[in-house]
Each structure stands twice: as structure tokens, then as C-alpha cells.
């Protein structure tokens, strides 16, 4: 019994004395913070670079249950100007937006814009959503972005939104 205890203590000592050196291999050329900043800058430039703006196919309702609308968006600086079939023919709505990095690169409409925020504000008995909204998002995760097409996913309801240049 005494020999078993000695061998057990010796084995534990050997396991405890192994090297704690951990060399992590870099899989990327740059740090995650620099890559996130570069992606935010790239997406911001893509939004502003479309000469005629973007056509946003905006869907509302859980699992697209309430259909969608088309929004025409032009991004410049920190402002977005929008027009829609919901507004008058010559009416545009302007508000602030931002592209930021949270858990992913996100497009957020920061100030109230009734063409987008209307669907995310409480509507009372008009909706089936427990939050009382029509199921619209105003914060979107940028899934993919190119000069011709940007794919978004609503942060709260998860509906896929497509923007085409």
C-alpha cells in the first residue's frame, strides 16, 4: 500500500511538472481588432460608393410573415437618405446611421427614421409579436458585402435583408 502511494505521488508530480509553454500559431496576418476595424471601414466605403444608392428589400414579421417593402437608400458621411413606397412620391427621410463592430460588423440606423423604425416600435393590438411590434429590425449584421450586393441579417428578428446597388 505504501508503494502504491509513493508511485501515485510520483506520477502526480511528473504530471504537474510538465512544461507550461504554449506557443500559439497565428492563423491571420493581423490582430482581430485590426481586422474588425478594416471590415467596418470597408463596409462603410461600400455603402457610400454606390453612385445611385442602394435598393433595400426589407422584410418584416417573424419568419417574413408580414411581407416586405422596398427602400431606396443613399449613404453619405453619417447620414442616410431614404425613400419608399410607404412615403409620398417626392418625399425622402434622412437620419443618422453607423457601421460598427460588435460581435460582427453591423449597420445600425441610429436616429428615428419612420421608414425603418415604424416596424420595430410597439403597435399595440396590431401585431402578433410579444413585444407588440410588427417584427422589424433597425440593426443589421452584415453577412456579406460587395460593390453590387450587401446581405444583412436582422439583429433581433433574424430576417434576411438584401441591398443591391
Which residues fall in each region the model found?
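Bacterial N-terminal signal peptides that target proteins for export
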Residues: 1-8
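Acidic/polar, low-complexity intrinsically disordered N-terminal segments immediately downstream
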Residues: 21-106, 114, 145-147, 155-157, ...
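C-terminal motif of bacterial Sec signal peptides marking the signal peptidase cleavage site
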Residues: 15-19
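Repetitive helical segments and hydrophobic/amphipathic motifs
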Residues: 11-12
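Beta-sheet ligand-binding and adhesion/scaffold domains
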Residues: 28, 110-165
Amino acid at each position: 500500500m505504501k508503494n502504491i502511494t509513493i508511485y501515485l505521488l510520483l506520477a502526480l508530480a511528473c504530471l504537474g511538472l510538465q512544461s507550461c509553454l504554449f506557443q500559439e500559431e497565428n492563423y491571420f496576418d493581423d490582430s482581430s481588432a485590426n481586422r474588425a476595424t478594416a471590415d467596418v471601414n470597408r463596409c462603410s466605403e461600400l455603402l457610400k460608393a454606390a453612385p445611385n444608392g442602394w435598393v433595400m428589400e426589407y422584410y418584416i414579421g417573424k419568419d417574413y410573415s408580414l411581407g416586405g417593402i422596398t427602400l431606396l437608400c443613399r449613404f453619405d458621411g453619417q447620414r442616410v437618405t431614404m425613400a419608399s413606397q410607404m412615403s409620398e412620391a417626392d418625399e425622402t427621410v434622412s437620419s443618422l446611421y453607423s457601421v460598427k463592430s460588435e460581435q460582427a460588423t453591423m449597420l445600425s440606423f441610429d436616429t428615428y427614421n419612420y421608414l425603418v423604425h415604424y416596424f420595430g416600435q410597439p403597435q399595440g393590438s396590431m401585431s402578433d409579436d410579444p413585444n407588440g411590434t410588427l417584427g422589424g429590425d433597425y440593426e443589421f449584421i452584415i453577412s456579406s458585402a460587395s460593390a453590387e450586393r450587401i446581405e444583412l441579417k436582422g439583429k433581433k428578428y433574424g430576417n434576411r435583408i438584401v441591398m443591391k446597388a
